[in-house]
């Protein structure tokens, strides 16, 4: 699962650096990452 988290972190970085208007998408990614981390704890 760490690989998926790394990919999401990379996507988030790309989105934020590419266009500030896409920060909403980055916010969605944050929520997805939170869900993935919660699953890892189970």
Swiss-Prot record:
Q: Which InterPro entries match?
A: F420-Hydrogenase_large-U, Ni-dep_hyd_lsu_Ni_BS, NiFe-Hase_large
Q: Does the keyword Membrane apply?
A: no
Q: How does it assemble?
A: The F420-non-reducing hydrogenase vhu is composed of four subunits; VhuA, VhuD, VhuG and VhuU.
Which segment of the chain is annotated as a signal peptide? none
Q: Which family does it belong to?
A: Belongs to the [NiFe]/[NiFeSe] hydrogenase large subunit family.
- This protein is called F420-non-reducing hydrogenase vhu subunit U
Tell me which EC number(s) this protein carries.
1.12.99.-
Cofactor(s) listed in the protein's UniProt record: Ni(2+)
**Can you name one GO molecular function term for this protein?**
nickel cation binding
Question: Which NCBIfam families has this protein been placed in?
Answer: VhuU
